[in-house]
Amino acid sequence: MKGRGATLEVEDLVLTFGGITAVKSVSFTAQASELLAMVGPNGAGKTALLNCINGIYRPQAGSIRLDGIDVIGRPLHTMAELGIGRAFQHAELFPHLTVVENLLIGRHAKFRAGLWASGIYFGKGLKEEVEERRQVEEIIDFFELYRHRDTPVGALPFGIQKMVGVARALALEPKLLLLDEPCTGLIREERENLARFLLRISHEIGPTILWVEHDMQMVSDLAHRVVVLNHGAKIVEGVPDDIRRAPDVIAAYLGQASV
């Protein structure tokens, strides 16, 4: 599963809904294989920005480039082909399907022979089906999900469902992995377990990771750099230690409390 991360360049991005500006001329770059965290209070524009990157929203101005390729305006279903994978805040899984089946769906963009050949299991379609299942088993091993591989996702604990959501995004072998608050709703033990896997993904697989998170301690422990948004605008970016001490961050995101 080892791969190469892509360079993500966001420049002067603007997104509006009616008279409300959700993203205000935001610019930043995530270097190849960087673990870049994005933080900010609720309503800061973090999820809206992710929605622009993977094609759910189309911004009114600015550019988004992945290894120099402009991704704005491309059909949503082509984002996986470009190398963009995403785990949503709410896992967005198929609850009646097993873990294996959800991960196979996550690899849909990797199938080359077409639905007809794959569906009747012969020739090139059969070979691709075998390869897809082999790749899925590797992901199951990586995330230590073998006990749950044949369990319907809806029957799993919430923390395991969140892990399956990240695993399904990784099943695309993305160059850019978007994580939207993967720790939301998790207890401390589950958060620590997810942090362990984020480090493994970064170190052992190597996609570029853009990670929206509220847990500043986890961000400080894991992220290479941090971008801070407030009211749709970027107020600062830098390494975690500098971000924790930045007056603008303390005032806008954390109140007057020390971090």
List each language-model region with its residue ranges:
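The feature captures the beta-strand-to-loop junction immediately N-terminal to the Walker
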Residues: 39-41
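Conserved ABC ATPase "signature" region
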Residues: 116-148, 152, 196-200
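Conserved ABC transporter NBD signature motif
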Residues: 62-69, 82
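Conserved catalytic motifs of ABC-family nucleotide-binding domains
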Residues: 173
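Catalytic Walker B motif of ABC-type/P-loop ATPase nucleotide-binding domains
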Residues: 177-181
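Helix-to-loop junction immediately C-terminal to a conserved catalytic motif
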Residues: 54
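Conserved structural motif at the start of ABC-family nucleotide-binding domains
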Residues: 8-10, 23
